[in-house]
């Protein structure tokens, strides 16, 4: 049961961060987001059904992988052309002791999440603007080979395709690459970095 609760907490944090990044970077028009309070902080969440359906499918898969301890990283990739990555946001999960954070750590977790949301807003508002209306995003779930095979054959996870990606070197020839460590939430073993190619 504790693994399920911990997975729920992490997936909720990932959902908040993905929505906030999409809003702050202007990947979708601001009018499809509504302000909500979470972690005692204002956040923006999508009210656009196609986007919500996509995110729900990704997060459902992430939650199951977390419960099985097979999720290594959730990566949000912003691109203009399929092979032209502009930004990459990696939420990495680090192996740690099992069990839930103690009650006092949940307060610390909430404070860390407030800090993360603030840092995302501050740091990404200073980043170069993305080309208006021409950017898209996709989410990659990094997992084990065994989990990939199991999920790609499980009918309840067939709402979107499971593809095995090839590791490619960044095609940033002649472009500046920025790596910004955004946050670390030690109690849950969650670390977030952003790679911005300009």
Curated annotation (Swiss-Prot):
Residues 4-196 form the HORMA domain. InterPro entries: HORMA_dom, HORMA_dom_sf, Mad2-like. Disulfide bonds: none annotated. SUPFAM superfamilies: The spindle assembly checkpoint protein mad2 (SSF56019). PANTHER family: MITOTIC SPINDLE ASSEMBLY CHECKPOINT PROTEIN MAD2, MITOTIC SPINDLE ASSEMBLY CHECKPOINT PROTEIN MAD2B. As the accessory component of the DNA polymerase zeta complex, involved in translesion DNA synthesis (TLS) and various DNA repair mechanisms. Promotes the apurinic/apyrimidinic (AP) endonuclease activity of Rrp1 and is therefore likely to be involved in the base excision repair (BER) pathway responsible for repair of DNA lesions. It does not appear to influence the synthesis activity of the catalytic component Dmpol-zeta. This is DNA polymerase zeta subunit 2.
């Amino acid at each position: 049961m504790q693994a399920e609760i911990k997975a729920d907490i992490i997936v909720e944090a990932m959902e908040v961060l993905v929505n906030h990044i999409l809003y702050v970077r202007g990947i979708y028009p601001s009018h499809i987001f509504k302000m909500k309070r979470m972690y005692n902080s204002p956040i923006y969440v999508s009210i656009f059904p196609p986007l919500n359906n996509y995110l729900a499918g990704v997060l459902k898969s992430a939650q199951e992988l977390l419960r099985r301890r097979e999720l290594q990283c959730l990566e949000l990739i912003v691109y203009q052309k399929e092979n032209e990555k502009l930004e990459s946001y990696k939420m990495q999960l680090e192996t740690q002791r099992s069990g839930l954070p103690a009650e006092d750590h949940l307060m610390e977790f909430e404070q860390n999440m407030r800090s993360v949301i603030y840092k995302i807003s501050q740091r990404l508002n200073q980043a170069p603007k993305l080309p208006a209306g021409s950017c898209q995003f996709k989410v990659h779930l990094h997992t084990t080979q065994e989990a990939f095979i199991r999920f790609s054959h499980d009918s309840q996870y067939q709402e979107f395709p499971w593809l095995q990606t090839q590791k490619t070197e960044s095609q940033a020839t002649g472009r500046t690459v920025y790596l910004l460590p955004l946050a670390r939430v030690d109690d849950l073993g969650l670390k977030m970095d952003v790679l911005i190619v300009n």
